């Protein structure tokens, strides 16, 4: 149970009661979409630190409310922002900002201007490794395991979840 910004107690609900009351790993919690694990982490952090972390991953939405329920993900993030944020996991902690134009040429092929992607280290390599292990567990043993029924054997990770009010990223 966490205390909200208004002083009220708040506890998340889970869709199931798997391993209710047991000690579980963060890996198991993420793989099985266990909201209590997320709430536990929020108790160790705080909503303001989480908002700063979200922004460091390239999410530009300045209207993200620093509330305890943010640990479950209830904020608007565009698909582009989500893809940009996940580049840090594929690039050993370096977030690569999206870049759609790399150069501009005139009608004779002369380069007028070039552009390079902005890169920023947002997470340590050791944290990236741990996160990738957990994201792979979602697909290999957790709530995303059904994707393997389609014969997909590629190394991949994921994060499943639910939504309210048709707000999907």
Tell where the protein language model's regions lie, with residue ranges.
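Short, mixed-charge, low-aromatic patches
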Residues: 1-12, 37-45, 84-90, 158-165
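Mid-domain, small-residue-enriched loop/turn segments at the edges of structured enzyme/sensor domains
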Residues: 6-15, 46-84, 100
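A penicillin-recognizing enzyme superfamily signal
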Residues: 28-32, 78-169
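Short, glycine/proline-biased beta-turn/loop segments that scaffold the active-site neighborhood
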Residues: 1-23, 97-110
């Amino acid at each position: 149970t966490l205390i909200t910004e208004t002083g009220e107690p708040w506890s998340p609900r889970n869709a199931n009661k798997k391993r209710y009351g047991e000690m579980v790993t963060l890996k198991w919690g993420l793989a099985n979409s266990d909201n209590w694990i997320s709430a536990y982490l929020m108790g160790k952090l705080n909503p303001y630190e989480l908002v700063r972390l979200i922004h460091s991953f390239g999410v530009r939405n300045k209207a993200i409310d620093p509330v305890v329920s943010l640990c479950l993900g209830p904020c608007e993030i565009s698909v582009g922002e989500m893809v940009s944020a996940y580049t840090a996991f594929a690039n050993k902690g370096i977030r690569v900002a999206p870049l759609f134009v790399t150069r501009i040429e005139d009608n004779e092929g002369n380069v007028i201007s070039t552009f390079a992607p902005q890169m920023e280290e947002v997470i340590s390599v050791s944290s990236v490794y741990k996160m990738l292990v957990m994201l792979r567990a979602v697909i290999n043993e957790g709530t995303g395991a059904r994707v393997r029924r389609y014969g997909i054997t590629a190394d991949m990770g994921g994060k499943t979840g639910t939504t309210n009010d048709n707000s999907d990223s």
